UniProtKB/Swiss-Prot annotation:
Involved in mRNA degradation. Catalyzes the phosphorolysis of single-stranded polyribonucleotides processively in the 3'- to 5'-direction. It comes from the Bacteria. Residues 551-610 form the KH domain. Mg(2+) binds at residues 484, 490. This is Polyribonucleotide nucleotidyltransferase. It comes from Thermoanaerobacter pseudethanolicus (strain ATCC 33223 / 39E) (Clostridium thermohydrosulfuricum). InterPro entries: ExoRNase_PH_dom1 (IPR001247), ExoRNase_PH_dom2 (IPR015847), ExoRNase_PH_dom2_sf (IPR036345), KH_dom (IPR004087), KH_dom_type_1 (IPR004088), KH_dom_type_1_sf (IPR036612), NA-bd_OB-fold (IPR012340), PNPase (IPR012162). GO terms for cellular component: cytosol. NCBIfam families: polynuc_phos, PRK11824.1. CDD domains: KH-I_PNPase (cd02393), RNase_PH_PNPase_1 (cd11363), RNase_PH_PNPase_2 (cd11364), S1_PNPase (cd04472). One of its GO terms (molecular function) is RNA binding. Pfam families: KH_1, PNPase, RNase_PH, RNase_PH_C, S1.
Length: 700
């Protein structure tokens, strides 16, 4: 393919796409430049479908290269390792809008790789990668019902900004990413500072106008350089087999579905499956997989039919009903804060831990953020769904869910000045039947309040679903697992009483329009307010006192010029304070100093030691010092951490002293008076001028 270059203006910057320049052996490849950010996106597909699977094997990789920001990787190996959390979240951003646009039943392996080659701080590389993935797939022979476009939206001074720069992102009240086709919205992800539903909806629709321009631009590229799509050969089920299975199993599946409790319902469905397979195994011994597929289709149809025609859900709820909620705080005696949040059969334990500011997470990546003082981690063990599988650390889903819950609480976390602690939340999913990420949001709020963290407002979350059959649209509140699995949308909305703090929308149909979004957001608001009311019945506000097991923080402000003295040569002075008191000390360049101690007493002791260092030594002042070492001509005495002076042998006593050891020894605490400080800062001390006469006489 000959090299071709395409350009368009997007939100005040030039978007440049080069085709045929690099990676020509991939099915599709696009070199995309926006500002000074450059991303190479490739798409490849296997020639044959993968046998024996019932899912679409799509993988998306987002490769961060530190050379893109002029960095050399740290560590001994000096090369990029496993993907960072940011890279995993970016890969999910690329994956989610394109996944529903592949043909249903397509089983060929498809791999999309976005490699970040150059990063302009004013241009987010993940947005460029999302556009590039659409280009690479659209021009290739891989079956894909795109193209899609993607933009970020900020809100600064009441104005929406498309693809905001670094400074605008810092000021923005929202960070919204929207992807869609020319006709509909496909994916939404946002973090916001209590934004009203109407504003969020307007932002999404505003983004769609720019998405249409991007899609039109990509369609023009496809017309010029696109190749014909390969034929999708889908497996067809024998019609006679399907009719017989439907006649035998439909009513049985319907009855099995009408079970409120998840485990019992799954057991009933398993029994129906075994009964049907047993019934047809002699007639269709080689078609058991086809029978399973027909049973799945029947289950999906019946579940959706119950909702669209009967307006009732499998567990007996109406479309707007929320499952029973119960909460408990302070469930763990030794942690700093803990809570259990239960909604139906979804249950999450969230634990809050408070640490020193030195415990912040340092991020070595290509993004804006360099350190995190607040973090949320989400664990989804196999027992939560009654399964057995190896424990291999967090997967992409767990990282994504943890980040969503983290984003939901971020706007209400107090600032470092208000609450000088590092905050870590861990959500353990104890039982899962849909919407565990939003249960983690609720559990996080309760755990923070139990820990005494002065959050600005409580946050709750709810997951909305969608069943769309023709013109019949059914929006579901508080979806459970089967409704997520067999439905058309998973729309998670978290926020306070005032507004939205985080949203995440994924769909399985080609897109949804403004009216569906509006309905979902309004129902989510009502659901969120109800859930908040149930949470506040358990704990109305953050506790006034921290847990007795939480560390105590003492704040000080010191002269920045004194920081060097506090640290001492090679860190000697500060290390000594830490060793003697058992505290942690964090010092900022502007002179802010934080002492984190397990108890207030040791913290106050460290504070006194630091004050002694920062206080100027004055001639005529008397200090209690410690003898550090002895020489033939006198004793060196430390009168403050890192500050020592000489008591000459002639100044040890009013009487003549033959040997220094006759009066003091190493380790003695003695009173001394400062008699002189020379131009070099050397301190002269006198013992004989510091002690009362009677004490001197008693000593001798």
């Amino acid at each position: 393919m000959e090299e071709r270059t395409f350009e368009m203006e997007l939100a005040g910057r030039k978007l440049l796409v080069q085709i045929g320049k690099v990676a020509q052996q991939a099915n599709g490849a696009a070199w995309v430049k926006y500002g000074d950010t450059v991303v190479l996106v490739t798409a490849c597909a296997s020639k044959e479908p993968r046998e024996g699977i019932d899912f679409f094997p799509l993988t998306v990789e987002y490769e961060e290269r530190l050379y893109s920001v002029g960095k050399i990787p740290g560590g001994f190996i000096k090369r990029e390792g496993k993907p960072s959390e940011k890279a995993i979240l970016s890969a999910r951003l690329i994956d989610r809008p394109i996944r529903p646009l592949f043909p249903h039943g397509y089983r060929n392996d498809v791999q999309v790789i976005a490699t970040v080659l150059s990063v302009d701080p004013d241009v987010q590389p993940e947005i460029v990668a999302m556009i590039g993935s659409s280009v690479a797939l659209s021009i290739s022979d891989i079956p894909f019902n795109g193209p899609t476009g993607a933009v970020a939206v900020g809100l600064v001074d009441g104005q929406f900004i498309i693809n905001p720069n670094h400074e605008q992102r810092e000021k923005s009240l929202m960070h919204l990413v929207v992807s869609g086709t020319k006709d509909a919205i496909v994916m939404v992800e946002a973090g916001a500072k209590e934004i009203p539903e109407e504003t969020m909806l307007d932002a999404i629709m505003y983004a769609h106008e720019y998405i249409k321009q991007i899609v039109e631009f990509i369609e023009g590229i496809v017309k010029e350089v696109g190749v014909p799509k390969s034929e999708v050969i889908l497996h067809e089920i024998d019609k006679d087999l399907e009719e017989k299975v439907r006649a035998y199993a439909t009513e049985k599946i319907y009855n099995a579905l009408r079970t409120a409790e998840k485990k019992e319902r799954n057991d009933n469905l398993d029994k129906v499956e075994q009964e049907v397979l047993e019934h047809f195994k002699e007639e269709y011994p080689d078609n058991l997989a086809d029978i399973d597929e027909v049973l799945y289709n029947i289950m999906k149809e019946q579940m959706r039919k119950m909702i669209t025609e009967e307006r009732i859900r499998v567990d007996g709820r109406g479309l707007d009903d929320i499952r029973p909620i119960w909460c408990e705080v302070g469930v763990l005696p030794r942690t700093h804060g803990s809570a259990i949040f239960t909604r139906g059969q979804t249950q999450v334990l969230t634990v809050a831990t408070l640490g020193a500011l030195g415990d912040i997470q340092i991020l070595d990546g290509i993004g804006d953020e360099e350190a995190k003082r607040y973090m949320h981690h989400y664990n989804f063990p196999p027992y939560s769904v009654g399964e057995v599988r190896p424990l291999r650390g967090p997967g992409r889903r767990e990282i994504g869910h943890g980040a969503l819950a983290e984003r939901a609480l971020e706007p209400v976390i107090p600032s470092e000045e208000e609450f000088p602690y590092t905050i870590r939340l861990v959500s353990e999913v104890l039982s899962s039947n849909g919407s565990t990420s939003q249960a983690s949001v609720c559990g996080s709020t309760l755990a923070l309040m139990d820990a005494g963290v002065p959050i600005k407002a409580p946050v709750a979350g709810v997951a909305m679903g969608l069943i769309k059959e023709g013109d019949v649209v059914s929006v579901l509140t508080d979806i459970q697992g089967i409704e997520d699995f067999l439905g058309d949308m998973d729309f998670k909305v978290a926020g306070t009483e005032k507004g939205i703090t985080a949203i995440q929308m994924d769909i399985k149909i080609p897109g949804i329009d403004k009216e569906i979004l509006k309905m979902a957001l309004e129902k989510a608001r009502r659901g969120r307010l109800y859930i908040l009311s149930k949470m506040l019945e358990v704990i109305k506000e953050p506790r006034k006192q921290l847990s007795v097991y939480a560390p105590r923080v003492i704040r000080m402000v010191v002269d920045p010029e004194k920081i060097r003295e506090i640290i001492g040569p090679g860190g000697k002075t500060i290390s000594k304070i830490i060793a003697e008191t058992g505290v942690k000390i964090d010092i900022e360049e502007d002179g802010r100093l934080y002492i984190t101690a397990s108890d207030l007493r040791s913290g106050e002791r460290a504070k006194q030691m630091i004050e002694a260092i920062t206080k100027d030594i004055a001639v005529g002042e008397i200090y209690l010092g410690k003898v550090l070492r002895i020489t033939p001509f006198g004793a060196f005495v430390e009168i403050a951490p890192g500050k020592e002076g000489l008591v000459h042998i002639s100044k040890l006593s009013k009487k003549r002293v033959q040997k220094v050891e006759d009066v003091v020894k190493v380790g003695d605490d003695i009173l001394v008076k400062v008699t002189d400080i020379d131009k070099l800062g050397r301190i002269s001390l006198s013992r004989k001028d510091a002690l009362p006469d009677e004490e001197e006489e008693e000593r001798n």
